[in-house]
Amino acid sequence: MPRSVQSPLVLAFLALAAVPSWGGAQAPTAAPTDPAARLTQRLRPIMDRPEFRHATWGIEFYSLDEDRPVYALNPDQLFTAASTTKLLTTGTALRLLGADYRFHTNVYRTGPIDRAGTLKGDLVLVASGDLNLSGRIQPGDTLGFTNEDHAYDADPSTSAVPGDPLLVIRQLAAQVAAHGVKRITGRVLVDVSMFREGARELGTGVVMSPVVVNDNLVDLTIGPGASVGAATTVAISPATAYVRFVNKSTTTAAGTTPSITWSSDVTEPDGSHTVTISGRFPMGTKAILYSYAVPEPSRFAQVALVQALREKGVTATLPAASVQKGFTSLPAAYRPENVVAEHVSPPLAEEIKVTLKVSQNLHASSLPMIVKAVLARDDTSKTGFDLERGMLQTAGLDLGGAQQTDGAGGDARFSPSFMVHYLAYMAKQKDAALFERSLPILGRDGTLWNIQPDVPAAGHVFAKTGTLAGYDALNRQLLVTAKGLGGYFTSPGGKRYALAIYVNNVSVPLDQGATTKIVGQALGEVAAAAYATLP
């Protein structure tokens, strides 16, 4: 990667910035009055903790004012990046589509509406890739979020955005009724031909589709029943005919651990699902949100739309599930005069904010396909990643420090040097301030809301988190394959910096919250130390 020419003293320091437990190099000999040397002294106790003895650290702090690195540790080594990948995914969408881009979800009629209000034809919702056909819609053309997104379920701190998850679907149905439609003789369809539906994103396993209703999730809030042995309480949102839940989970004594599973998921002949809830939930424990990922998002949306139409007094029949296939003959009807309902999304800038603040895997995984569909739909030789690569190459970035196969970070690797140079590139763009504000804020919101909330750096470090972990059966513990942090801060002295912090392969206990408590807080300490030390 092209780097600014540095003085011999700076280059010597960068080469010596690691100690043996961090990568095998010699300890720095620079005077303790040097900010980088003082930073090294502050970081060493963090990285020398016993829990990191088998881990590998990679760090770079980059001066945006001087266009040069001021501290680096293993800067050119590739690290498993996890959700810091979303910095590239969202940045690409922001640069190529623009902050003001809006999704237009239209509902078309394929036939005439007679005087009695009968639509003699089909009603077709054409999916536009809008990722927020949900209750995220807020006043002022904005999108809401909670710090612990409902996609990361089964955690006591997880919650859904307050409001109606079918808000947009109901609004579309109301518009159809307002057009005088009282009965539909044809089918109610959802056209998802924008890109192929069916693949599951690599983070939380939600099915990707051009239509996204409530993040393609059904939220179940499960709590204890009235007594030990009683059935648990279950609140479903949204409740539709697409899925029926059979509750076989029971209430256990206080002090036990909640354990809820979907023990079976049966597809019925009509395309609906019957899901059995099994497991236990203890007395005295606050209800917890669990999310069911719908297997066929287009069918889910179709059922929800038919339900909403009926609520508005429109007679509509739910077609057989097999009808929801192939849309080659429909686009001829997609003309302005046939629009009977339309939803225009808030600007893309709001979507970028949601994806980055809460690390929304479905949204990030879908963005490369959306960018491709919008900008190069008819060019079968190009993918969304081809468009991203072209942007990065035009920026002059060395892609030898980057590997990416999905939008969310389920399988991606970046070097700290590549990441800070990418962030430096984004900091020079017209939407730089918007991009930075969209990042989680240390100790304040998003996935950093509970990281280092009481240090001077809290409220001043804007950075995307990344976490990838799996069960280590041999040692009965959790292996944090990757933990990362990438973003920006302005020092108390007014200097601007980009940062990339990675640590790979850290073993932690299975206790809930151990990854955040041990590894997440440590990365926050590193960022906070840089904020307090660099000029």
Task: Identify the function of each model-found stretch.
Residues M1-S7:
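Positively charged n-region of N-terminal signal peptides that target proteins for export
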Residues Q26-R49, R95-L399, G493, Q521, ...:
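Conserved serine DD-peptidase/penicillin-binding transpeptidase domain
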Residues A72-T92:
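Short active-site loop at a secondary-structure junction
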Residues N74-F79, S291, A408-G409:
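A short glycine/serine-rich beta->alpha loop
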